[in-house]
Amino acid sequence: MPEGHTVHRLAAAFDRAFAGQRVRTSSPQGRFSEAAQLDGMVLLGAEAVGKHLFLPFAPAADVDPGAPVVRHVHIHLGLYGSWTFAGDPGFADAHAIGAPRLRMGEREEELDGAADWRRLVPRPTVRLRIAGAHGLADLTGPTACEILDAQGRQAVLDRLGPDPLRPDPGGRERRRFVEAVRRSRTTIGALLMNQKVVAGIGNIYRA
């Protein structure tokens, strides 16, 4: 399962690839028909919190991400989910592995540099396709892929502990983690795996 650092890397790739662009969205698999609600909207950016990815969509690029009109696509890759990017040279990641295509998940694979991403037919397993001016991203096999309003997004965040990769200028989140550990009699290894205590850590960093 991709851990927090991978999801943060994924969010950064989305920012570079799509932030501020009006995009096309579809669900070739048909299991995320809500994609039609987002088609033609602007993808404001991307946010990673622990193992969760949030993609805020709005009618225009100048809409505040916290505005009521914003719809947040919430994605958790789980054990089998992955994103595949394809596009113009340098798309999504200036240091992309196997550019111009990289898979952000458990696996990474290469696309023939001569191939035209605009002609790529989505696999039947693609839950969500996002296409912009210079490339596209295909999502397959996620545990969660849903549209949330601001309250729904906050409900997900309220279930999570601090994410050590997010800015914490006042140290509030660090103190929250320390207090949770001190209150518990559970072993530190088990606490690190508890997403309510600290978000994003999995077996790799626990080990």
PLM region spans:
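Structured catalytic/nucleic-acid-binding cores of DNA maintenance enzymes
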Residues: 1-207
